[in-house]
Amino acid sequence: MTNIRKMHPLAKIINNSLIDLPAPSNISAWWNFGSLLAVCLALQILTGLFLAMHYTSDTTTAFSSVTHICRDVNYGWIIRYMHANGASMFFICLYMHVGRGLYYGSYTLMETWNIGIILLFTIMATAFMGYVLPWGQMSFWGATVITNLLSAVPYIGTNLVEWIWGGFSVDKATLTRFFAFHFILPFVASALVMVHLLFLHETGSNNPSGVSSDSDKIPFHPYYTIKDILGALLLILILMLLVMFSPDLLGDPDNYTPANPLSTPPHIKPEWYFLFAYAILRSIPNKLGGVLALLLSILTLAVIPLLHTSKQRGMMFRPISQFLFWLLVADLLTLTWIGGQPVEHPFIAIGQLASILYFTILLILMPIAGIIENYILKW
């Protein structure tokens, strides 16, 4: 058996990635989120596949088909709610995973980090298009507002929007193509995950101390496989509690009203996991400026490795940077709250301040903190 595991071309890849992989002996629960994301992706693809068997991507029947899934299909309701709330769990794990990378300086593994950013964009695009599919009020108006942002692109903006819509408004063509993209992108994400892991295994994992762990490695199996299984069970427990007891907790009541192009909802907002970016978008009065800020809110992650000034890798022994990191977390929570509020005083001012603070912490204060900490340690 050992020979097959180590000799067979396919089994060897799996063995070197999940069984005999040398892993640092001190990685904490913050390193669990990678495997949890894999569980989320598998769960989303599986539940999504079963939903696609019963869903119709036509404006006249899309809303009814989702209702049909919930009412008439055997266990359709549980599949639908696992898929909807699974997306929320996915983003919780994603943000924790990125946060871990920021805190412990995992962004120094440049290739892995950059593929991770592309993955983040892919999954955000997938989630946005998935939100359009039930064809409720918030689906329709969310699609209209977000796709309309592309009209801010100089010269080609209007043509670009109409090209994406497949017409002069969000309609049947838009829904059909969004369904097609929503179906294919998770598989693109799966391929990117493989590349992500490929680059990670080239260098080996980071660890909480930030120093090389080459002198102290342990096999991934059984030490971290058992830890990952525990994490996955906890994830599924939380997901199922959400699905069984409060499936609509994170959704929008407006999406239970069929899409109506003649009636605009009083407050158009995306799902909770996009609210921080939506708040940054809204905090700039200029359309093009808002769109650029929206893109930069995620793209800023790409320049983080270039702005690393500290001689230490992680923030474990850097109190000033730690303070700034948790200030950033609080700022993102504030932005998430603001994104769900109406555009009126005092929310506009709070959103603008929080947006400025977000970019200031990441691009200015954190590099300065690194320099100060080096100086304090006489480095």
Curated annotation (Swiss-Prot):
Its placement in the membrane is given as: Multi-pass membrane protein
Subcellular localization: Mitochondrion inner membrane
Cofactors? heme b
Task: Spell out the InterPro entries in the cross-references.
Answer: Cyt_b/b6_C, Cyt_b/b6_C_sf, Cyt_b/b6_N, Cytb/b6-like_sf, Cytochrome_b, Cytochrome_b_C_euk/bac, Cytochrome_b_N_euk/bac, Di-haem_cyt_TM
Membrane-spanning intervals of the chain: 33-53, 77-98, 113-133, 178-198, 226-246, 288-308, 320-340, 347-367
Q: How is the cofactor bound?
A: Binds 2 heme b groups non-covalently.
What's the main place this protein lives? Answer: mitochondrion
So where does a ubiquinone get bound?
A: H201
Quaternary structure, per UniProt, is: The cytochrome bc1 complex contains 11 subunits: 3 respiratory subunits (MT-CYB, CYC1 and UQCRFS1), 2 core proteins (UQCRC1 and UQCRC2) and 6 low-molecular weight proteins (UQCRH/QCR6, UQCRB/QCR7, UQCRQ/QCR8, UQCR10/QCR9, UQCR11/QCR10 and a cleavage product of UQCRFS1). This cytochrome bc1 complex then forms a dimer.
Give the misc comment.
Heme 1 (or BL or b562) is low-potential and absorbs at about 562 nm, and heme 2 (or BH or b566) is high-potential and absorbs at about 566 nm.
Q: Which protein family is named in the record?
A: Belongs to the cytochrome b family.
Q: What is this protein called in UniProt?
A: Cytochrome b
**Annotated gene:** MT-CYB
